[in-house]
Curated annotation (Swiss-Prot):
InterPro entries the UniProt entry points to: RNA_methyltr_RlmE, RNA_MeTrfase_FtsJ_dom, rRNA-MeTfrase_E, SAM-dependent_MTases_sf
Keyword Protein biosynthesis: no
Cellular location(s): Cytoplasm
Role summary: Specifically methylates the uridine in position 2552 of 23S rRNA at the 2'-O position of the ribose in the fully assembled 50S ribosomal subunit.
Name of the protein this chain belongs to: Ribosomal RNA large subunit methyltransferase E
Length: 226
């Protein structure tokens, strides 16, 4: 717990916590840590036992679209650290498979694969574990960044396209695809592709997304088939 500065606070309101700069920590890392400590959704996630604030993003999407329900089959691409898996299973989903390059602690009753989704062996394995075609494919995949904004953005868009292609290939009729994206940039092509196969494609920005972030989610519903 971070203690408030001596002398109390202004008008009874807690001041944002500040961290002493640690050896080897860059200014950007310092800013990220302070933002995490002071972020209400991060604090709420810790208090409720969710592995990340992203759990609240997917919960807001589900509040609107009601994807998570008993009997639904769900695939979670880029599932680490497991917040989306936690929210889905908490809301009644029992048939769910997640995949990530990083290790993910178990989330019962989900199946979790530590694999590269782009490995040709991965999609068949996921479908085998799921026991059939999914009702929902959700993607929070993120690439390794190189620090060059345009290059990093193109890599993100590339992963959205890979996730969308997979969803179009495997979804049940009437199914849905949800993917993290960013406003602007090169997403027009993937949105056009989704509109060919889904009855509705929208941008959705949850309240749990930071207001200063360009993060949005693509939500495609009513899969019409290949």
């Amino acid at each position: 717990m971070v203690k408030p500065p001596a002398g109390g606070n202004d008008g009874g309101r807690a001041k944002p916590a500040r961290l002493k700069t640690a050896f080897g920590r860059t200014p950007s890392q310092q800013a990220w840590l302070e933002r995490q400590i002071n972020d209400p959704f991060s604090a709420k996630a810790r208090a409720l036992g969710y592995r990340s604030r992203a759990a609240f993003k997917i919960s807001e999407i589900d509040d609107k679209y009601r994807f998570f329900k008993k009997g639904a089959k769900v695939i979670d691409l880029g599932c680490a650290p497991g917040g989306w898996l936690q929210m889905a299973t908490e809301r009644g989903v029992t048939d769910i498979v997640g995949v990530d390059l990083l290790p993910v602690d178990p989330v019962a009753p989900a199946h979790i694969l530590e694999m590269d989704f782009t490995d040709p062996a991965c999609p068949p394995k996921m479908l085998e574990l799921l026991g059939g075609a999914p009702d929902l494919v959700m993607s929070d995949m993120a690439p390794n960044t190189v620090g060059h904004r345009e290059t990093d953005h193109l890599r993100i868009v590339g992963l959205i396209e890979i996730g969308a292609d997979f969803a179009i290939e495997v979804l049940k009729p009437g199914g849905a695809f949800v993917a993290k994206a960013f406003q602007g940039g090169e997403t027009a092509a993937v949105i056009a592709q989704l509109k060919k196969h889904f009855t509705k494609v929208v941008h959705f920005k949850p309240k749990a997304s930071r207001s200063d972030s360009s993060e949005v989610f693509l939500v495609a519903t009513g899969f019409k088939g290949r």
